Amino acid sequence: MYKRQVFTAEEAKAVANRLGYPVLVRPSYVLGGQGMQIAISDKDIVEFMEIINRQVQEHPILVDKYLMGKEIEVDAVCDGEDILIPGIMEHIERAGIHSGDSISVYPAQSISQKIVDMLEDYTIKLARALHVKGLINIQFIVYNDQVYVIEVNPRSSRTVPYISKVTGIPIVKLATQVIIGNTIKGLGYTPGLQKKADYIAIKMPVFSFEKIRGADISLGPEMKSTGECLGIAETFNEALYKAFIGAGIRLPKHKNMIITVKDEDKQDIIPIARRFEALGYRIYATLGTAKVLKENGIKVIRTNKLEQPAPNLMDLILGHKIDVVIDTPPQGVEHQKDGFVIRRNAIETGVNVLTSLDTAEALATSLENTDLNNLSLIDIATIARR
């Protein structure tokens, strides 16, 4: 990825304009994505630089080109020569949302064999080049049928327990053995990417926003989840459904939802809204979103924005009439105030709030063709041995 180190707002603006917006602005060393921001204008750069410099002193700040692609994650074990890759994990949310806050799917469902081969090849080359003995974690972006490296971590990651559990490969034990001199082949394993499972395992982030007053629930580069859960099934839909339930997504009572999305998402929301309509949802939307949905044959009830007379969005939310809010915040700091009020009040009222179209699409998928009264039971202790 294209990257530059800067120290001042003027330097950051120059790099951002050379790379082209949007860009990712972040401290040179962070944990959990702390201080990371996506900037879409010079105004954002100035504000973000002030925030970062208040938190991190005397360290360079990185400005990267931001690519809206498919994020992929790989954990592997390297003995210095051979590399074992238990599996490839695909994030449902596009790049820009912290990996710890993204829904992760094993095995990856939407990438081609060509991309799989590239991911395996890059993982092997990177592990060897870095002389890794033990665990390595690599995060990739697939963008326009090309693979880019986001970051390489020569260590364990939060996905290690997940990928070990769902593949049955004890990669922590293997990493420990290779660190003390054993080899992957000597431990009885074939190097390379292992055969993918015939079931779907989904890692779902768990949030505690209702307990953290004043926290904005919109997702971005900074990690906000406080836990995770696992959904396993033989179909993608059912695995998603189990994961959503495990994460605390409440089942609909009224089948009423609010949709309010940024301008860039108005065309992409159309097929998603159509799917929820087919599931029996009544859709409320503000003027701009309602106009687009209505023009595309979707039944929608127009409602007023916060600053407009009642009944408006807040009346619907506080009246306990809404099950789901889909609200995609516009990028940039100057646009976020009204959306924050909507999201905060919704979460405090017990309403499910989704701030990514990818998550909203996943929720629709989980409700389609899933027999809610006949969910399968999966034995996690034996399924990976099949």
Give each language-model segment a name:
Residues L135, Y143-Q146, S156-L174, V178-L187, ...:
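Acidic, glycine-enriched active-site microenvironments
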Residues A14-V15:
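Gly/Ser/Thr-enriched, mixed-charge loops and adjacent short helices
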